Amino acid sequence: MYVDDAGGARVGPAVFDQPRTLELGADLGATGLDKYGTVGPRLGLLAGDTALVASIRARAFEFGLEARPMLYPAALRSLAGYRPERVRVLVETTRRVGQAMSAVFGARLHVTPVTAQLRADDLLALAMERAGLATPPIVPIEATAALAMLLLEDYGVLTVHFAGMPPGTSSLLLKFIPPETLERFGGADALAKAVDSSVDRLAALLRDRAALTALLLGEVTSSPARATAPIGS
């Protein structure tokens, strides 16, 4: 049995006192090293039955998917420096951000034990309310993408949606926030205020199709017919 445990390989034991992946009886378990208490590099880590790992490693080399040897020392340092306490600190920091966001967005903020989320449907509805619109000019995930662009443009906040790595959700997802990063930003209240201000800017842009198109797609240089096509098409 193979388990792709992703960040849960650390979050489960550290936060919820759950068994480690291989303690569940799995033959193989995989996780990544780029988040949730580890510091990179961004590669996969496979562990388990020695013979199975060797076979999979050989096939990875055949496909050119293996981790480059130059990354081994960085991976080793990341593993050696991992502490479950760090994961709990990240969760606590996220909880404080969630509290600050709840004070601004109320019931529209969706909170889980380890995340705070502005769901795309709620985000678009909120922006439309602030803009006084009854008909959405974009689809929900475009609202999240636009908010991500605005947060980066105005506050230097880099989110998954801007970076172009397909997330598992259309929500604006806040999780496992380093306290050092939050402190440099000015604290949880400052971050919540930044998101709120960016939602205000998003609301204004909903009434300006050209500006919204430029925000999401850059300056459109194609034919006029293509340039005026609906954003959500």
Residues covered by each model-derived region:
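Conserved PLP-dependent catalytic core of the aminotransferase class-I/II
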Residues: 80-130
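Conserved C-terminal alpha-helix-loop-beta "cap" of PLP-dependent enzymes
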Residues: 110-214
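Generic non-transmembrane alpha-helix signal with a bias for helix starts/N-cap capping motifs
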Residues: 14-15, 94, 144-145
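Conserved PLP-enzyme active-site core in the AAT-like
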Residues: 1-87, 98-102, 160, 176-181, ...
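Short alpha-helix boundary/capping motifs
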Residues: 11, 91, 141-142
